From Swiss-Prot:
One of its GO terms (molecular function) is mRNA 3'-UTR AU-rich region binding. This is Exosome complex component RRP43. One of its GO terms (biological process) is exonucleolytic trimming to generate mature 3'-end of 5.8S rRNA from tricistronic rRNA transcript (SSU-rRNA, 5.8S rRNA, LSU-rRNA). Component of the RNA exosome core complex (Exo-9), composed of EXOSC1, EXOSC2, EXOSC3, EXOSC4, EXOSC5, EXOSC6, EXOSC7, EXOSC8 and EXOSC9; within the complex interacts with EXOSC5 and EXOSC6. The catalytically inactive RNA exosome core complex (Exo-9) associates with the catalytic subunit EXOSC10/RRP6. Exo-9 may associate with DIS3 to form the nucleolar exosome complex, or DIS3L to form the cytoplasmic exosome complex. Exo-9 is formed by a hexameric base ring consisting of the heterodimers EXOSC4-EXOSC9, EXOSC5-EXOSC8 and EXOSC6-EXOSC7, and a cap ring consisting of EXOSC1, EXOSC2 and EXOSC3. Pfam families: RNase_PH, RNase_PH_C. The gene is EXOSC8. Non-catalytic component of the RNA exosome complex which has 3'->5' exoribonuclease activity and participates in a multitude of cellular RNA processing and degradation events. In the nucleus, the RNA exosome complex is involved in proper maturation of stable RNA species such as rRNA, snRNA and snoRNA, in the elimination of RNA processing by-products and non-coding 'pervasive' transcripts, such as antisense RNA species and promoter-upstream transcripts (PROMPTs), and of mRNAs with processing defects, thereby limiting or excluding their export to the cytoplasm.
Length: 276
């Protein structure tokens, strides 16, 4: 009977749970799904990570290549993110050129990289005006069940922390790049941005880490990105119902708490990988 009611009146079905301060999957309104991260998942990439947020699964692979710097920024490299939402992750997506949601997610990740200064572009310079690194960050969703932005941000950060670049010098006689694969170093990750997403129900009720179904039924969504100092790096609100100042402040304080949880989880995984 409950399954039939959910099919016919999905929003009313959800409201009955929300009135009791819980959700159909058993979580409280402010409770996140189980989050896991696996670092170094792709052996052919220069850095990679697999993140699971409940059922939502995103893998990020980073590939480093040489490039010529732009004339207006001769000492800066590039970080190029791309989010792919293929049909295999959900029946809502079609094959072909990137859909609107994938484009929005790619732009969101690009904004996070730029605003948080996670990597100083100058750190990617090999020889000013001649040669820089370009980091291609490909994020692929393997299973879509809502809150793709949180999963992508976490996967990107974890993958970048896994990247090791070889030492590169320019031979003065030949002007060619010489790569020393035996001498590698990790990227200098300057900040640790973490995204926290919320769904708004009936213009007033806030829930964290929405599933795909909850996003579909919500009257609005909001994603806040904070760094370890509690600074706001990014705020993404694609239309929908408005929020009061008090509600927004509540979201930001929850985002600070979530940052600590995610950072702790990632630090533990990285520590467990290091040779004893």
């Amino acid at each position: 009977m409950a399954a039939g009611f959910k099919t016919v009146e999905p929003l009313e079905y959800y409201r009955r749970f929300l009135k009791e301060n819980c959700r159909p999957d058993g979580r409280e309104l402010g409770e996140f799904r189980t989050t896991t991260v696996n670092i170094g998942s792709i052996s052919t990439a220069d850095g990679s990570a697999l993140v699971k947020l409940g059922n939502t699964t995103v893998i990020c692979g980073v590939k480093a290549e040489f490039a010529a710097p732009s004339t207006d920024a001769p000492d800066k490299g590039y970080v190029v993110p791309n989010v792919d939402l293929p049909p295999l992750c959900s029946s809502r997506f079609r094959s072909g050129p990137p859909g609107e949601e994938a484009q929005v997610a790619s732009q969101f990740i690009a904004d996070v990289i730029e605003n948080s200064q996670i990597i100083q572009k100058e750190d990617l310079c090999i020889s000013p005006g001649k040669l820089v690194w370009v980091l291609y960050c490909d994020l692929i969703c393997l299973d879509y069940d809502g809150n793709i932005l949180d999963a992508c941000t976490f996967a990107l950060l974890a993958a970048l922390k896994n990247v090791q670049l070889p030492e590169v010098t320019i031979n003065e006689e030949t002007a060619l790049a010489e790569v020393n694969l035996k001498k590698k170093s990790y990227l200098n990750i300057r900040t640790h941005p973490v995204a926290t997403s919320f769904a708004v129900f009936d213009d007033t009720l806030l829930i964290v880490d929405p599933t795909g179904e909850e996003e579909h039924l919500a009257t609005g969504t909001l994603t806040i990105v904070m760094d370890e100092e509690g600074k706001l790096c990014c705020l993404h609100k694609p239309g929908g119902s408005g929020l009061t100042g008090a509600k927004l402040q509540d979201c930001m304080s929850r985002a600070v708490t979530r940052h600590k949880e995610v950072k702790k989880l990632m630090d533990e995984v990285i520590k467990s990988m290091k040779p004893k």
